[in-house]
């Protein structure tokens, strides 16, 4: 159906209704007869709802009104009904202006009983047809008569006149079905439009979702790409280490083969047509036969590395001639990228290290290369050299940032400021030799630029450049060793100094446009760069023909560089191992001796199951160090371990045995306690230490004699007895490597390589025992065991049998334990008694660095933190010049006392030495003193912590007082109690220290020297000057212990609110120091306070001794519910 005809009909209907509305306001309701107008039905039909087009009789009006709430017109009685008896009668007739009113037709609500207002002759108001609040459905054709419901009985009223409709199309031309069809089409169009809109919104949402998914996948891709690159770097590093471990290079062991050497089979035949060997690079690119562009030489991945990776990516010049310019280290290089690989790709596998570089001494080798191949080789050598120059410039640029932006301003702050937030010592610890390293980097870059940018295609002198700079690479050793200290100082300053933190944050803003986030990421650059120099030199060496003038300098540079890097790597491994020992020390709980010793190194750890009788088996988490084997049990829901047992490897043997159930079992045996000699460092004779002290006081600097190592010819040939019984069980005791055996009537040979011995045991007369990491037992009902022993009787040994996770795990454990048993025994054979007493520090070769001052001693000495071969410890330094002999003797007495002490609550003695005019005493380092903790604390300690701290101090005091010759401390106070803090800030690892005023007491000996800190001194110590006083003894420490505990409770020194003379008088009278009233948990503290009051009794005999204190404090701690060991 076409749309033009219905449209015309709509327009006609609209004009009709507009005319009717206009005539209503003008008062002219006469409608002329129109032939084309639709015929109005008789008046028996009422047009009661124009909007709906529904026509019904009056009898149906009430029902229609109930069903349709939208009908706004209520039908009333017929206008022609003048009688009250004819209310329900409907009259029919033609519509005229005398009995019909258009106001009823268009009124949205039923009309009121009041007569309508007279028509206005003026212009119709704004409430025209289109502005009236009536919703008219013009899609329906008005049919039927108009029912006038006006209640006005005046027939002559204009409102009662009949109405003639005109201007409408004929009835025959208006089809209701067509209108309804048009409506449906319009509705369909509208629905189609809404559906299209919905689809567009759906597509937009789906597009957004796909975009987010693409971003996620892109992030995952780059993450996997980063992991892949890191794994490749690790693999290349592992491959280089494996190649380096093949052999140790020497001057005469280098056999060079050029990069274009073919295989031995190719080179054996004559002729010059030899295919050049392709060199694979780390980035995925490779050198082909012809020179390639930079993009083909190396594939660069731009990745961000914030901490430990290399600083720069693998960049290469494009081979074009560069104009020579001045090196600037203040301008950022053009290419700044960060890669997780090295600055420079590692050389090929045949040239990864010095040990794998082969230099052929055949002078005819160079003649095998054609001229074209030789020139290509030199060109690639030049390209690699340009790449090294570029990366060296970038490296120097970032070093210059460290020096100019950080180091120099901090130096000025420490030197010129009246109140510096950083000291000179901290600046030195933080940056080390960065300035010297920057100078060496600039020197290398300038030398390389002078050689490479001279316009020649065959630069000569590269070998001399690296040989010259190799001596400077030794500076990296001290920097790498100091790196961990540098990072710890940096973190500590950030935490403690707001000014330093603000300074660092301000300076780090210049790194926003780089790939480094902070100063710590810059400080790691020299650590990673030193390893890259080796790859650079080795790679250039592999590209240098033997006939080239740079060959010999490069060979010397390779040897020098390898020795330097090996030393640096060894120090890095030592630092990592020592850090691991410190971590294990903090994770261990229970009663155990200090694990953190200078010579101790971490080896491995893992879970082992102890094989017990029947079904009894205990699981231990074992830690293997280079001198001890520690058994512990993991604590559930914690990263801590409970200490169980320590096995000294110098007295141990490891045994690999087979099991009928084919379980991976091995055994560790140690000498029984009854038969062991106490070789504890602090329990040895004091002759060695006393001699050392005498030498120091006499300023004797004579060198010590070398150790005499006597060896006999039977070291490598020992007998092994294999006795066979009825079950064909064979046991082989291996006492050394390379031994002959005699098994019954047969003979065989056993070889032991790398600490791993494998036994092939057969019932033949001839037995061969090879080192193949397997044990094959072909005996009937037989068990084989291999014992690593020192020839002692096994009846006096205690055995521990463990089950490993697998055979491979068992072999790894046995290999590691056996290797460290051998090294531990060798160290004990060569160490002197005084060296053992010093805790394993060899001061003659140790690298000792004095760090910041952390305190001062009572004998005129200073206390510093220091590092001994990277191991952090505390040192007391006494200057002998212009120092009274009394103070020197006091210092020596402290050393003599500390040598004898070994307890978990006593500071550990590590060693001493005489250096020039200074006497050094090395002790275990603790970061805090109890005085520092009390001063910084803002709220009182909980009662359980107070009791625990008092118990730990009492244990240390008990150890001193119960020695064979009791030791009195005489200066017990918070400043002489060292401690650590756990991750929650609670006090832990309490140690009693500072024994410069301590004294050994004999039986019945009393002291009469007034010494100590006044507010902590006992009354009898203050009265020692009186003639009637008989002196004091160990009970004076009990008084000082009470005063120390009063300060822990109140967080204030005893008698702090009184003047000095008043406090002395109160002490002499035995008055207890006042305590604050706002104590935490006073009921729990009440027993402790009562105990402390007994400790300050004026009669020393009425005071409890140290052992009684420990017993009572332990009982108090149990009553609080706090677990103790």
Curated annotation (Swiss-Prot):
Residues 92-106 have a biased composition (Polar residues). Residues 113-124 have a biased composition (Pro residues). One of its GO terms (cellular component) is cytoplasm. Its cofactor is Mg(2+). It catalyses: L-seryl-[protein] + ATP = O-phospho-L-seryl-[protein] + ADP + H(+); L-threonyl-[protein] + ATP = O-phospho-L-threonyl-[protein] + ADP + H(+). Residues 601-822 form the PH domain. GO terms for molecular function: ATP binding; GTPase activator activity; guanyl-nucleotide exchange factor activity; metal ion binding; protein kinase activity; protein serine kinase activity; protein serine/threonine kinase activity. Residues 59-91, 137-161, 694-729 have a biased composition (Low complexity). Belongs to the protein kinase superfamily. STE Ser/Thr protein kinase family. This is Kinase and exchange factor for Rac B.
């Amino acid at each position: 159906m076409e749309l033009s005809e219905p449209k015309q009909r709509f327009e006609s209907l609209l004009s009709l209704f507009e005319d009717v509305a206009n005539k209503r306001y003008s008062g002219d309701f006469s409608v002329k007869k129109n032939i084309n107008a639709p015929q109005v039905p008789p008046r028996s039909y009422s047009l009661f709802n124009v909007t709906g087009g529904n026509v019904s009789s009056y009898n149906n009006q009430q029902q229609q009104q109930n069903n349709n709430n939208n009908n706004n017109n209520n039908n009333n009685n017929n206008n022609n009904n003048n009688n009250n008896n004819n209310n329900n009668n409907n009259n029919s007739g033609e519509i005229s202006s005398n009995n019909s009113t258009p106001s009823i037709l268009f009124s949205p609500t039923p009309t009121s009983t009041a007569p309508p207002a007279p028509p206005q002759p003026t212009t119709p108001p704004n409430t025209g047809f289109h502005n009236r609040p009536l919703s008219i459905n013009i899609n329906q054709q008005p049919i039927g008569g108009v029912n006038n419901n006006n209640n006005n009985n005046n027939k002559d009223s204009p409102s009662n006149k009949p109405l003639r409709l005109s201007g409408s199309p004929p009835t025959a031309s208006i089809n209701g079905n067509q209108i309804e069809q048009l409506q449906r089409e319009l509705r369909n169009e509208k629905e189609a439009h809404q559906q299209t809109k919905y689809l567009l919104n759906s597509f937009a949402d789906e597009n957004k979702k796909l975009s987010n998914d693409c971003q996620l996948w892109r992030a995952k891709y780059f993450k996997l790409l980063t992991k892949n690159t890191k794994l490749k770097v690790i693999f290349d590093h592992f491959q280089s280490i494996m190649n380096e471990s093949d052999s140790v290079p020497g001057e005469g062991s280098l056999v060079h083969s050029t990069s274009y050497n073919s295989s031995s089979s190719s080179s054996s035949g004559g002729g010059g047509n030899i295919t050049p060997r392709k060199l694979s690079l780390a980035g995925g690119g490779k050198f082909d036969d012809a020179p390639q562009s930079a993009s083909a030489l190396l594939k660069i991945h731009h990745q961000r590395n914030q901490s430990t990776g290399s600083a720069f990516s693998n960049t290469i010049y494009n081979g074009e001639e560069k104009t020579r310019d001045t090196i600037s280290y203040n301008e950022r290089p053009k290419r700044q990228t960060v890669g997780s690989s090295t600055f420079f790709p590692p050389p090929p596998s045949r040239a990864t290290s010095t040990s794998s570089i082969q230099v052929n001494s055949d002078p005819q080798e160079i003649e095998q290369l054609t001229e074209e191949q030789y020139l290509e080789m030199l060109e690639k050598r030049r390209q690699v050299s340009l790449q090294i120059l570029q990366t060296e410039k970038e490296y120097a640029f970032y070093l210059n940032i460290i020096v100019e932006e950080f180091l120099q301003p901090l130096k000025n702050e420490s030197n010129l400021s009246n109140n510096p937030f950083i000291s000179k010592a901290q600046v030195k610890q933080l940056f080390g030799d960065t300035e010297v390293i920057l100078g060496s980097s600039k020197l290398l870059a300038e030398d390389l630029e002078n050689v490479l940018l001279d316009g020649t295609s065959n630069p000569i002198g590269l070998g001399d450049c690296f040989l010259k700079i190799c001596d400077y690479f030794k500076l990296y050793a001290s920097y790498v060793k100091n790196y961990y200290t540098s990072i710890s100082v940096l973190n500590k300053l950030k935490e403690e100094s707001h000014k330093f933190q603000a300074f660092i944050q301000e300076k780090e803003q210049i790194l926003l446009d780089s790939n480094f986030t902070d100063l710590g990421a810059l400080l790691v650059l020299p650590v990673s760069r030193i390893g890259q120099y080796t790859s650079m030199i080795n790679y250039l060496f592999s590209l240098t023909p033997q006939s080239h003038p740079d060959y010999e300098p490069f060979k010397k540079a390779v040897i020098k560089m390898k020795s330097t890097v090996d030393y640096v790597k060894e120090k890095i491994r030592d630092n990592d191992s020592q850090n691991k020992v410190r971590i294990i020390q903090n994770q261990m709980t229970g009663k155990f001796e200090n694990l953190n010793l200078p010579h101790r190194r971490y080896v491995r750890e893992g879970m082992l199951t102890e094989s017990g009788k029947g079904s009894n088996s205990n699981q231990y988490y074992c830690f293997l160090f280079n001198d001890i084997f520690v058994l512990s049990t993991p604590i559930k829901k914690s990263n801590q371990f409970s200490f169980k047992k320590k096995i000294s490897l110098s007295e141990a043997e490891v045994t690999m045995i087979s099991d009928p159930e084919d379980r991976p079992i091995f055994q560790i045996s140690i000498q029984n306690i009854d038969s062991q000699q106490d070789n504890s460092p602090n329990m040895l004779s004091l002759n060695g230490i006393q001699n050392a002290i005498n030498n120091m006081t006499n300023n004797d600097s004579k060198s010590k004699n070398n150790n005499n190592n006597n060896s006999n010819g039977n070291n490598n040939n020992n007998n092994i007895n294999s006795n066979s019984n009825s079950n064909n069980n064979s046991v082989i005791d291996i006492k050394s490597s390379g031994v002959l055996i005699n098994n019954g009537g047969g003979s065989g040979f056993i070889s032991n390589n790398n600490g791993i011995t494998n036994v092939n045991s057969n019932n033949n007369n001839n037995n061969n025992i090879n080192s193949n990491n397997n044990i094959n037992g072909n005996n009937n009902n037989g068990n084989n065991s291999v014992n690593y022993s020192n020839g002692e009787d096994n009846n006096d040994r205690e055995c521990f049998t463990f089950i490993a996770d697998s055979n491979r795990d068992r072999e790894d454990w046995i290999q590691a334990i056996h290797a460290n048993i051998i090294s531990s025994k060798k160290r004990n054979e060569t160490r002197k008694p005084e060296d053992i007493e010093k805790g394993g520090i060899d001061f003659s070769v140790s690298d000792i660095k004095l760090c910041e001052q952390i305190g001062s001693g009572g004998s005129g000495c200073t206390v510093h933190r220091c590092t001994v071969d990277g191991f952090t410890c505390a040192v007391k330094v006494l200057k002998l010049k212009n120092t009274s002999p009394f103070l020197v003797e006091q210092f020596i007495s402290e050393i003599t006392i500390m040598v004898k002490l070994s307890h978990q609550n006593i500071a550990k003695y590590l060693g001493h030495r005489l250096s020039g005019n200074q006497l050094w005493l090395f002790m275990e380092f603790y970061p805090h003193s109890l005085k520092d903790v009390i001063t910084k604390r803002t709220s009182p300690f909980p009662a359980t912590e107070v009791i625990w701290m008092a118990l730990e101090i009492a244990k240390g005091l008990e150890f001193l007082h119960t020695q064979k010759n009791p030791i009195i401390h005489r200066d017990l106070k918070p400043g002489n109690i060292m401690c650590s803090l756990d991750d929650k800030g609670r006090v832990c690892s309490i140690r009693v220290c500072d024994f410069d005023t301590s004294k050994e007491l004999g039986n019945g000996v009393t002291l009469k020297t007034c010494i100590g800190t006044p507010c902590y001194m006992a009354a009898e110590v203050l009265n020692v000057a009186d003639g009637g006083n008989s002196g004091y003894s160990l009970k004076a420490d009990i008084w000082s212990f009470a005063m120390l505990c009063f300060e822990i409770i109140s967080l204030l020194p005893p008698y702090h609110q009184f003047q000095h003379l008043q406090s002395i008088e109160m002490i002499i009278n035995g008055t207890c120091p006042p305590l604050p009233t706002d104590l935490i948990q006073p009921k729990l503290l009440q027993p402790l306070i009562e105990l402390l009051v007994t400790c300050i009794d004026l009669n020393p005999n009425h005071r409890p001794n140290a052992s009684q204190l420990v017993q009572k404090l332990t009982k108090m701690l149990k009553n609080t519910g706090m677990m103790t060991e």
